[in-house]
Amino acid sequence: TGIYYTDSADKAIIETTLARAQAFERKPFAIEVLPLDNYYSAEEYHQDYLDKNPNGYCHIPLGLSQEPLIDDSAYNKPTEKDLQTLSPQEFEVTQNAATDAPFSHELTDEFKSGLYVDITTGEPLFGSSRKFESHCGWPSFTKPIAKDVIRYYKDNSHGMQRIEVRSRIGNAHLGHVFEDGPNGSLRYCINGSALKFIPKNELLGTKYEYLIPYID
């Protein structure tokens, strides 16, 4: 399998995207990233193939996707005025990478059905179906509601080697991700102060309503 580019500036974007996807997989990808040196037009039968054949062999209905598409244009990076609405602890956690004291936040023991969003932007981050009791003292999830909403960074602070997770639009510090989740999964260890929880029954009639099938 390969990804081929015509503009050398695209190479870094492709490699960054692959690195983010690789974080969700244990086996290394076997995907080459190379300049496009040869290109041949397909025969007429395959021109505009899916327009001519809506149920064609290479068509995958979006409705079968296991995770939703989160439109990044629907959310904005918070302004200084927006950040002033945060509590002192929420500000310290999201903006200065502070950490909630273990077992101190109410969302640690929240297990109702609903959606967890970035407290600084409202961007969806986690669904309740992926939350589990980790007994570590912080809200824990096996995966985000969609891969693209999380950013990953190496964190060597405090004499440890960890992977920090931040929100896509707000660049808010969320917590860290570890490899000790249930049944070989990951554990996203998230500060409750970085999250806002919206119960399932409050999603109806909002811009989040389409996400209901992905939180149960």
Where are these regions (language model features)?
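Flexible coil/turn and secondary-structure edge motifs
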Residues: 1-216
